[in-house]
Amino acid sequence: MCFIGDRNVAAPEEASADGFPPCQGPAGLLFSGHFMSAAIYNRKNPCLAKLKKAVRLSAPESPKDTRHYELDLSGSGMTFEPGDSLAVLPTNDPGLVEEVLAALGCSGDEAVNDLDAKPTTLREALISSCAITVIDKKFLQAIVTKVGEPAAALAELLVPERKEDLAKYLYGREVIDFLLEYPQAKFEPQEFVATQKKVLIRLYSISSSLKAHPESVHLTVATVRYESRGRKRLGVASTYLAERIDENTLIPTFINPGKGFRLPEPEATTPVIMCGPGTGIAPFRAFLQERAATKAAGKAWLFFGEISRQTDYFYAEEWEAYLASGVLTKLDLAFSRDQERKIYVQHKIVEAAEELFAWLEQGAIFYVCGDASRMAADVDRALHEVIATAGKMSAEDAQAYVARMKEEKRYRRDVY
């Protein structure tokens, strides 16, 4: 999701020439020759896009698995702007669903109503409706009620005063952990469904411009896989895209507008500074495609960082081409493990203090996209340091300078 400020989201069609619909609208209706407003698409009425292309960006030897996806929007009429996000409504991992069913002592064929009150089977509700990797407090309360004294410690965490302690306790835990820890907690199928949250929409910053790639949308996604408490954990949406879709899958999507995360008008001479390490590069790829298509005036400076140039330099040929054509004025790269001392984008920002401050004095907009937990804070500190040192200001004056940038909408963040 792209906007001024931070986003807080829970680390998931017209007929083609062969007659198969690349993208369908609500309820599977085809919109042959009739372009529909993007506003009609939402969670209840998503655009059903199809996978057009999937490419692994990170090399096989990289510890990361970052991928490039292209979804076909042909005939849907769905439009977006650089800076928008694509909402993806994923399904859960079938293997995890089977584990939950086994822990519940259910076959999966039991009749239930899902969380939209639609009749279905328990298995299908767990696949498509319930957020079984996220814990709802109703579920924990049900565990406490059913188990009694053995769950006393858990009960103590459910009082409002222990909210932070509960959040720490739940970190890295999923529904399956509690079902296995408290096997004496027995649930009827419908009762269990009622204790769950709805499967969460995942928002991905769009990494393409419609002017460069009409009727398609590109995503740059890090596949999340990790271990916690002795179990392998999977990012719901990222592994849905990486493992559970193919060219025939209808992927429910809609646009989430990034109203404040926008480029200046093409004719404006306003410089833009873009800081997007890792998958934070996504909206800036869209920005540069848009600038190339509109022959935008004004300078552009990109900061990108990853683990290694050899394994994780995403879209390298595109950046080099933009430099050569003048669409991109400057490119600074930070590959953290390519030298003894780890170097990140914030270090590159500080190294370029004099020139970067000169751009800011020319009215540059400073954009940041990516990790909110560490990167965004580190970049923010670097920005303050640049302004204080190159601008020969006190820390208080640098803070006031950044505050003015925010007021003037020249400091824009899409962090998550």
Residue locations for each model-derived region?
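FNR-like FAD-binding dehydrogenase module
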Residues: M1-Y416
